[in-house]
Amino acid sequence: MPQRQQGQSLLVLVVLLGALLSALWWTTEAGSAVNEKQRLANAADAAALSAAVWQARALNFDAYTNRAIVANEAALAQSVSLRSWSSHMTRLLPGAALVTAWVPYLNSAMMTLQRLWHHIDAALQPSLMTLEATTSLVSHDIAAAQRVMHLGTAAVVPAIVRESLAETDPRYRLSTGGEAATAVWATEWLRFASFYGGSFRWRQRDVVHRSLDGFSSDRRYTLSPLLGTSLVRFEKRGGTELVDFDNWRGLDTLSLHARRGILFGSLRERTPVAWGGAESGQASLSRGEHGDSYRRNPRASRLADRAVRRSAGYLGLPSLYDLSAAQRERFAPPRILVRVTLDDSARRGAKALLGFASVPTLAGSEQRLEGSAPRWFAESAATTPFERPHPRSDGAQELPSLFSPFWRARLVNLTSDERIRLATIDGAPLWLAVAP
């Protein structure tokens, strides 16, 4: 009888089982790696975008507080203007009452208006002075909040990146390159905007002056009593200005201008009719234009200077943040770079899912199955461009500034230089760094 061979099928089964287990392990490992890489990339995107959202909010907060302070300064200018104009009216109405004393009905109306305005001015002056002091105090509180927000952002943004990663997955953390990138970002953030204080407050003073209404900035008119002639005329001049950054000053003058001769000679100030002035803040020897009052009505202006009603409630124009000089020339908002890492030992791969990391061989030993990378990386970048939600109605392009709250958070692509720099710090292969 022929002899039967036994045991050969067991060898084939061992080889087949090892091949099947290896295929299962590597399939599971590949799927796990893809999922983990995607989660790592999503975590990096979420951290970068969350940090950029805070950066945009900080810039918009700067813009809103700047606009609030400008609005308060305009309100202060209106208050000082009203006090100056009211003081001017208290001197104008008695003279007007004398001129109209011979006119029936008008004389009694003018006398009543004179007495009424005297009481109005008596209540108006102290009330507006109190309002000016309160408004100035509020403006400086707003400026202090702006400084806290702006400087605090340098510490908040890195904390947001780390917190976002921890909330996504406690295993994720910033790599060494990612930590270095946050330090670079903090430096760029502090250079992006400059703190305009002291004599550099001319920027916000210019914005404030251009934001004033017509009554505050220039109160002038010319009245010719003798229509059709140029023999005499009344010249009203006045205006309110921020003098030396720490003093709001208003002046109002009215003078009679006439020719030196009856028909010849230039029209010049002959008689001051009414004048008034008001200021709030530190006393200053400087003076403004005040609607060309000093040139057109010099005598009345000197009288107004001596009659200025002063208030020390104004604390000065607050120091504010705005784009630095370098950023105004070449606009480049700070870029938030995030590079996340995960140790392969902490990854939930085929070993954790299947419970084994080796397969049997014909020699009776175990062949270990291991992943390809000891560490995993993912990077992302975000920034805050200046974008209006809708185009301007006049078609003009608005330049970036910290007076307009149009800062938006957006994810952007990393440049090759950024990828190489991060990979170099982390010790990763440079040939992989340039791959998107």
Task: Name every feature range the model reports, one short phrase each.
Residues 1-84:
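Alpha-helical assembly-interface signal, strongest on the long, hydrophobic N-terminal helix that forms
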Residues 70-436:
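Long, compositionally biased low-complexity segments
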